[in-house]
Amino acid sequence: MALPKIGYDIGNEGVRNNCFCFLQDHFEKHPDRACMKWVNTKSKLWFDYNPFARTLTHDTFTYKNIHDMVVHVAAGYKKLGVQKGDCALVYVPMIPWLYAGMFAFQMLGVRCIFLDSFARADQLGYVADLCKPKVWLSGERGFSMGKGQPALEAIPVKINMGPCTKTWTARFEDLLETPEAAEPVAVAQEHTALITFTTGSSGTPKGADRSHRFLAAQHYAIDAFLPYKESDLDLPVFPIFSLNNLAAGVTTILPAINVAEPADNDPYVLYTQITGENITTLTLNPSLLNGLNKYCLEKGKTLPGLRRVAAGGAAVSRDVVEEFAKIAPNAELVVMYGSTEAEPMTHITGKEMLAQRSVTETDPELVDAGVNVGHFAHGLQYKFIRIVRGPIEVASDKQWAELEVPQGSVGELLVAGEHVCRTYYNNPEAFKTSKIRDHNDIVWHRTGDLGRHDEQGNVWIVGRIHNVIERDGKYLFPVQAEVVLKRQPCTRLAAYLGVPDPKLGEKTVCVIAPKDNADIKNQKLCAERETEIRRVMDKNKIPVDQVIFHPDIPMDLRHRSKVEYGILRDELKKSGLV
């Protein structure tokens, strides 16, 4: 008899609601299938320091290996007093034992708090104070970061993973040897399985409350537009897609790079993994996609074995799509648009992007007003509303009509649906500012993204509501301007932002980080480049009040693809440049 879908058990609670059942099912169907492959520390060090190295040796865990680790570790957790309803803070990089540790918590009904490995000590402290975890799973580096953070020091159960010099409550390696095997507990559909935090680019990071039902719905939504074959070997740089692979029964190759600390040789490492392991599918951010493009084009290399690459986390330009087509001629490129709270929202293939009519076709110096991110995911409800800074309440259809913008006009995108996160963990204020519960009891997520919906059903993103520039009574958006700036031959990174101005309200500032920072001291060269930038921007009808050449531009730590406008603005003010 076919098993019911995970996350849709009838009744208030049920074992089949527990997302661990995804892993259980694949263990029962194909226990000997490779589940995860990774490069161990010794092999990576040999590769990094051996100039003649051309291959990376990968170790393998089967679905049976992972399943057995999970059930025995979960039994070990229970002996430590960890139980259903507790919160567990997980601060571990992308290694196989991360997923074993997380699934072991989830099968017990423990609320698992996952933080990116680049999180700072103050962010760890904030999360611990918000969620009040009973247990902390981390390497010794994480525990050392907890010094001076009362909420972290107060966590009663600390489990160390990896080498350690101090004695903690328990060692993860010892829990793997627990003789007993735990059974999954029954949970309600809306029982919290995972809490993941936004980057905080628009303020304090918010903890998205991902229930067992939500994780199941998200898996089915991703699987609908990114279906995998049993033979696929997938390399995802996003932890959430590794979790999705475990739910899909796909073999995952973990990236042998530190996504939190980008290195110059990352594209070479990825190329080596892709070719050496015969990887067929890839999920990565635009920054890594761009780096892989440039590496292959400069070295004259191609990736004929790839059948699909999915890119997400930030906008992907037509230029990057065109470059990718040259290095991976047999691969379909899928550009995903989503967020911590709703993934996926839209998607578009590279071929669809290139088939769209563009103003660049008539003049290569012209740039479209926004980035086309494609059509909405199946089952997603959406609205575009006028720009409103602050909470919104909707109690009638009339109020919705007053908020919504006409078809094709720019507005803030709102989404609702099964795979849209409905609340934030222990944070009613975040719900108030980022959600709208309307008179029909539908919870709408305010994405904070500004865009428009064209007659062909495509969504065009033009910027973020927090980064919109109000200049002389008109709204200006960064996306188009930054594409123009990035096309300049001298540009490494670029930003277009507003700063307070007594006459205009806000003035526009173009910030360019050149490929060679030594150029910044060459006043004549900078003047020539500024003249050219102003000319091209004027041609695109984009006002420019100031041009600054700056050594660097701060980017978001998660994707290395989004400008941290607030930090950049503060840097420019502190330096007296604006």
Segments predicted by a language model, with ranges:
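Conserved AMP-binding/adenylate-forming core of the ANL superfamily
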Residues: 14-15, 35-95, 99-103, 120-125, ...
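Conserved pre-ATP/AMP-binding loop-to-beta segment of ANL
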Residues: 34, 166, 170, 176-197, ...
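ANL superfamily adenylate-forming
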Residues: 44-55, 135, 141-189
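Conserved AMP-binding A3 loop
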Residues: 60-64, 193-220, 251
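AMP-binding/adenylate-forming catalytic core of the ANL superfamily
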Residues: 119, 136, 272-275, 282, ...
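Conserved AMP-binding/adenylation subdomain of ANL enzymes
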Residues: 216-233, 238-281, 295
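Conserved AMP-binding/adenylate-forming
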Residues: 322-336, 340-451, 455-458, 465-468
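Conserved C-terminal "lid"/linker of ANL adenylate-forming enzymes
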Residues: 495-500, 509-511, 531-578
